[in-house]
A protein has these predicted regions:
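Basic/polar, cationic surfaces and motifs that engage anionic cell-wall
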Residues: 2-24, 44, 134-139, 148-231
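N-terminal catalytic cores of peptidoglycan-degrading enzymes
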Residues: 1-134
Length: 231
């Protein structure tokens, strides 16, 4: 695998035929902005030192459709008449006007889709805190895995994650990998109880550690930030 082409200087992923990511693709999302550290200091400093893992399925428990892809690309229409007339699809209407994104999405079949270059800020973590720092979007890369908190993830998803995590760590000075639930406790639960953290630990390059303890979030600082946000 070529280190200089797998993730480019601009933070774009390129698939390699010999890897599970041969089916990788880039679907540009409109939902991103500049990382504030880079805006202030230019390209001289790279603040990205955290990877945040999530799960997602739309509707909940439905895999393989295009709803997640459309959500991140800003083309999700909750009023589409060609979607199933099923109560399970009704919650999608609450997503109307929601602007969210992620850097990467790993489908159940191992396919990897990138939406935002890693040098840019994707909108995946929301109100969050990691070890005293609020706004984790500022300094993290987000990876969404297609799944729920009720079923295990697939072997090929871990295989793809095993390719993707080291590639990101080569491009950015990543120190930690965490889950959304650990930076937004009480508000989020992903990547859920079926995510295999032990297996993930074996995928990490030297110098990168898991941060999966409740103390990794400064709850008081996060509560203050949430109170400010609600005013």
């Amino acid at each position: 695998m070529s280190e200089d082409t797998f993730i480019t200087q601009e933070g774009r992923l390129k698939g390699v035929p010999s890897s599970p990511l041969y089916s990788s693709s880039f679907h540009p999302s409109p939902y991103w902005d500049e990382r504030p550290q880079l805006t202030k200091s230019g390209a001289a400093g790279d603040p990205v030192d955290l990877i945040v893992l999530h799960f997602i399925s739309l509707p909940a428990g439905t895999f393989g459709g295009d709803a997640v892809d459309r959500l991140f690309m800003g083309t999700l229409d909750p009023d589409r008449r060609d979607w199933p007339q099923d109560p399970a699809w009704e919650p999608l209407k609450t997503l109307k006007g929601l602007h969210v994104s992620t850097h990467f999405f790993i489908r159940r079949n191992g396919e990897v889709i990138q939406y935002v270059p890693t040098v840019k800020r994707a909108w995946h973590a929301g109100l969050s805190n990691f070890r005293g720092r609020n706004a984790c979007n500022d300094f993290s890369v987000g990876i969404e895995l297609e799944g729920t908190g009720e079923v295990p993830f697939t072997a090929v998803q871990y295989q793809a994650l095993g390719e993707l995590l080291p590639a990101i760590c080569r491009r950015h000075p990543v120190k930690w990998v965490t889950g959304h639930k650990f930076i937004a406790p009480g508000r989020k639960s992903d990547p859920g109880p079926f995510f295999d953290w032990g297996r993930t630990a074996q995928l990490l390059p030297a110098g990168v550690a898991l941060a999966i303890d409740e103390t990794d979030c400064d709850r008081e600082a996060l509560a203050r930030r949430m109170a400010e946000h609600s005013n």
